[in-house]
Amino acid sequence: MEIILGVVMFTLIVLALTVMILFAKSKLVNTGDITIDINEDADKSFTAPAGDKLLNMLSSHGIFVSSACGGGGSCGQCRVTIKEGGGDILPTELSHISKREAKEGCRLACQVSVKQNLKIELPEEIFGVKKWECEVISNDNKATFIKELKLKIPDGEVVPFRAGGFIQIEAEPHTVKYADFDVPEEYRGDWDKFNLFRFESVVAEPTVRAYSMANYPEEHGIIMLNVRIATPPPSVPDAPPGIMSSYIWSLKPGDKVVISGPFGEFFAKDTDAEMVFIGGGAGMAPMRSHIFDQLKRLHSKRRISFWYGARSRREMFYEEDFDQLQAENDNFRWHVALSDPQPEDNWTGYTGFIHNVLLENYLKNHPAPEDCEFYMCGPPMMNAAVIKMLKDLGVEDENIMLDDFGG
């Protein structure tokens, strides 16, 4: 009898607690529709069920805020200004938003759970962002670990991007086997050496990532990306490979891909100052876009140089393009430094890391490096080394432009 009474009492307590929780939830959490007031413009504002993240709500209503990490809170790009509602800023946002910015209402849309009516402000250019379903034209190796993905924009459509801009590419849940990758024989040596074909990428959720465009605005009808495969580091061989890079490497001509854009902040300044471009690896993409735009579209007479770091001749690409630009433009010079040239390369050019080569062979004897504009994109270690070198030369932050795809 005591056991039965105990079970009954326990059940009643659980039921009572459940009722209390549901009652509290009904009072504290808005489970009905809420209103998102955008820029105090009724045509841009909308109503939606409460509970989702602000980034997702905006996207579902055709407003695409930049989010290079796909809403994971790590890139800090999906900034919005919240005037009313939104609650307190979260610890996950504080590494991207300063105290001053937080006081002004700056938040990360991917971290804001919408539980009440909001009043927000968005830059006007966001409303020019669109989605397109593109078709893969080609997806070819340009280096051992870098593919050039070329996409066809739908007929009659235009992606109104600026040189240095980027798009976001979407992937549905998928499984990718590296053994199915089409890697030309000339690049297979390192793939076999490090047993990379054994990897698989299994993704259960839709994914979004950002990539800088390698084409420039007058290369119409296409989007061109340089994508480096993100394999697990040798020190952590059991780590999962890169989600989006694995997906992109699996794409074949004729496949359909959804992109959104354009986005960007890595734009050239409209001045007459000398431009120095510094790149490495897949950081080639915005370098190519910028340099082609300056010389082929704008016919710039600014002094321009491009310094690119690669491991060996096999990792160099777009050589003919830049050689031709150099031959056609007296104001442009480009230089490559190989950090690990192979015997078969018969390399007679610069060797070493690109920041050292740039310093020793150009900037050290430059009359005023602090007056130049520096545009860079490459691996994080390269970026850090270049920035330190430039700071040591007295270059101010305002003249150092970085496309920080490596975080």
Curated annotation (Swiss-Prot):
Disulfide bonds: none
Ranges that cross the membrane: 3-23
Enzyme class (EC, first level): translocase
Residue span, 2Fe-2S ferredoxin-type domain: 32-126
Entries under SUPFAM superfamilies matching the protein: 2Fe-2S ferredoxin-like, Ferredoxin reductase-like, C-terminal NADP-linked domain, Riboflavin synthase domain-like
Signal peptide start and end residues: none
Cofactor note: Binds 1 [2Fe-2S] cluster.
Topological relation to the membrane, as annotated: Single-pass membrane protein
GO molecular function: 2 iron, 2 sulfur cluster binding; electron transfer activity; metal ion binding; oxidoreductase activity, acting on NAD(P)H, quinone or similar compound as acceptor
Gene3D superfamilies listed in its UniProt record: 3.10.20.30, Nucleotide-binding domain of ferredoxin-NADP reductase (FNR) module, Translation factors
Subunit description: Composed of six subunits; NqrA, NqrB, NqrC, NqrD, NqrE and NqrF.
Record NCBIfam families: nqrF
Function: NQR complex catalyzes the reduction of ubiquinone-1 to ubiquinol by two successive reactions, coupled with the transport of Na(+) ions from the cytoplasm to the periplasm. The first step is catalyzed by NqrF, which accepts electrons from NADH and reduces ubiquinone-1 to ubisemiquinone by a one-electron transfer pathway.
Protein name in the entry: Na(+)-translocating NADH-quinone reductase subunit F
